[in-house]
Swiss-Prot record:
Pathway linked to the protein: Carbohydrate biosynthesis; gluconeogenesis; Carbohydrate degradation; glycolysis; D-glyceraldehyde 3-phosphate and glycerone phosphate from D-glucose: step 2/4
Main localisation: cytoplasm
Keywords: Cytoplasm, Gluconeogenesis, Glycolysis, Isomerase
Top-rank taxon: Bacteria
Gene Ontology terms for molecular function: carbohydrate derivative binding; glucose-6-phosphate isomerase activity; monosaccharide binding
GO cellular component, one term: cytosol
Lineage: Bacteria, Pseudomonadati, Spirochaetota, Spirochaetia, Spirochaetales
Catalytic reaction(s) noted: alpha-D-glucose 6-phosphate = beta-D-fructose 6-phosphate
Protein name: Glucose-6-phosphate isomerase
CDD domains the UniProt entry points to: SIS_PGI_1, SIS_PGI_2
Enzyme Commission (EC) number: 5.3.1.9
Length: 530
């Protein structure tokens, strides 16, 4: 029988609450750095936790807590197609987009879901080949050179993170066949800026909306249609691809578009980058070969996440450490720093992934909980952020745990030697220096120059940021968030918190504000400029 208890009801969490953090200054040795290291997918992508404030005693309690909370058994429920998203009575099938690990998952209409995702994937590959070969051309007979994805939230953040992570790698390996762009915000300046910067005659547009009725996406789609028409493109649907649910408004009512690819309601937007939501654009921009490597990395990491041993399961251990830091040590945020310009959009995806998933105040049974849930997720790119907010991280009054991400080699393989070292060596040296500085600090009798240290961090690293590596890292964070949700006893797969604002916005747009003085007053100031 699987145990669904609140975090503070678990006996091993009560034990964990009494355990002090490890003192990093005294234990951070070469031996520890070597031993406190796990491969995320069993091969070349590593998670190192030597600079976390834990020791063997913590690890023992983590193991007992994981076993008590049945974390691996709950993961297996997801893989086997149980309706884990209980508030919406849905399965959670994003793992199935990159390979089958559990039992056959059969939907109510008798459809095998792995076969559904695989057939969509083959359709994506075939469509990309037709575009690349020039067999499918624009409305005016031009070969497509650009792709613009229009969507918001998970229809933009994850795909954009993967696109920017892989773009330079694809260029170096002659696999960058089209240029990718994104429009997400309802601010018309964004649509205008993107559309005015490209040749529309040579651009394919991907419209992503699960329901087919997303406010921002509908508005931006209409902006696009107007732009296409004003450029003399009457058959504008020949340049538009739709990604949506099979039974959505877009699928049922809007016909004649170049192609339709289908999502499934068992996958929330923030977990959708390895579905059609992310893969259509990636296959068009970077080819089938790149997509297959992303899926391979994610699938291998998914499989390794089944390991019951917390010392050999990176996302499971990362989740347990996160709970310890949030609910015992009271650290309220987590900073993601990638020492790779290509990953500049990745922490933005992780913000949504973690905060939308676990930013809840009721448990899976709709009961109010009395312990902390998700941390604030934020971040940036090294070394840039060393010259902005690292002052606060080093000497501020709040301790902020960090995830560092780094790679041994660059993607474009171009560099320069200055002051007897390459720029890439300088980049890596700064990454190492920050981990040590945060962990050990440096005493100084001048309080203004004193560094206390004891700022914990983890390091994810690999030889190079490849499609395989980014797939593995994506899976790591998805599964970490999942395990955190299990520990917190919340439903990580719904997002009721986004609904109220949508409802009020529609009310304001309909001028239905007279019953609320605050809404009416703000409307006069901002909308009507009274």
């Amino acid at each position: 029988m699987i145990n669904y208890k609140n975090l503070n009801e678990l006996e091993n969490f009560k034990i964990l609450e009494r355990i002090d953090p490890e003192v990093l200054k005294t234990v951070l040795t070469g031996k520890r750095i070597k031993e406190y290291d796990i491969t995320i997918e069993g091969d070349s992508v590593h998670y190192n936790y030597a600079s976390k404030q834990i020791n063997e005693n913590h690890l023992k309690i983590f193991q007992n807590l994981s076993d008590e909370a049945n974390l691996i058994e709950k993961y297996k429920e997801i893989l086997n197609g149980e309706r884990v998203n209980i508030s919406e009575n849905r399965k959670v099938l994003h793992h199935l987009t990159r390979g089958q690990i559990g039992k056959d998952v059969i939907e109510d209409n008798k459809e095998n879901m792995r076969e559904f995702f695989q057939s969509e994937l083959e359709k994506i590959y075939n469509f990309a080949k037709q575009i690349h070969s020039g067999n499918i051309k624009s409305a005016n007979g031009k070969k497509f050179k650009n792709v613009v994805q229009i969507g918001i939230g998970g229809s933009s953040l994850g795909p954009k993170a993967l696109y920017s992570s892989i773009k330079n790698y694809a260029k170096k390996h002659n696999l960058a066949l089209m240029n990718g762009y994104f429009i997400s915000n309802i601010d018309p300046d964004e649509s205008a800026e993107v559309l005015n910067s490209i040749n529309i005659d040579e651009t394919l547009f991907i419209i992503v909306s699960k329901s087919g009725n997303t406010l921002e996406t509908k508005a931006n789609m209409q902006f696009l249609i107007n732009k296409l028409k004003s450029n003399g493109i009457k058959e504008y649907k020949k340049q538009m691809v739709i990604i949506t649910l099979k039974n959505s408004m877009l699928a049922l009512e809007e016909k004649g578009y170049l192609e339709y690819f289908f999502m499934h309601d068992s996958i929330g937007g923030r977990f959708s980058p390895t579905s059609a939501v992310g893969l259509v654009l990636l296959a068009l921009c970077f080819t089938e070969k790149i997509v297959k490597e992303i899926l391979k990395g994610a699938n291998k990491a998914d499989k390794k996440s089944l390991n019951k041993n917390v010392k050999d399961n990176a996302p499971l251990l990362a989740a347990l450490i996160s709970i310890y830091e949030r609910n015992v040590l009271n650290y309220s945020s987590n900073c993601i720093i990638a020492y790779s310009k290509a990953m500049e959009n990745f922490y933005l995806h992780l913000q949504q992934l973690e905060m939308e998933s676990n930013g809840k105040s009721v448990n899976r049974f709709n009961e109010t909980i009395n312990y902390k849930t998700v941390r604030i997720i934020w971040g940036g790119i090294g070394t840039d952020v060393q010259h902005s907010f690292f002052q606060m991280l080093h000497q501020g009054t709040d301790i902020v745990p960090m995830d560092f991400i780094g790679f041994n080699e660059t993607q474009l393989k171009e560099d320069v030697i200055s002051d007897n070292s390459s720029s890439n060596d300088k980049l890596k040296a700064n990454l190492i220096a920050q981990i040590i500085a945060f962990s050990k600090g440096k005493e100084n009798s001048n309080k203004n120059k004193n560094f206390k240290g004891e700022r914990p961090s983890a390091l994810i690293y690999s030889k190079e940021l490849t499609p395989y590596a980014i797939g593995s890292i994506l899976s790591h964070y998805e599964n970490k968030v999942m395990f955190e949700g299990f520990l917190l006893n919340i439903n990580s797969f719904d997002q009721e918190g986004v609904q109220l604002g949508k409802t009020l916005a529609n009310q304001i747009l309909k001028n239905d504000t007279f019953e609320d003085e605050a809404i009416e007053s703000y409307s006069k100031k901002i909308l009507k400029q009274d």
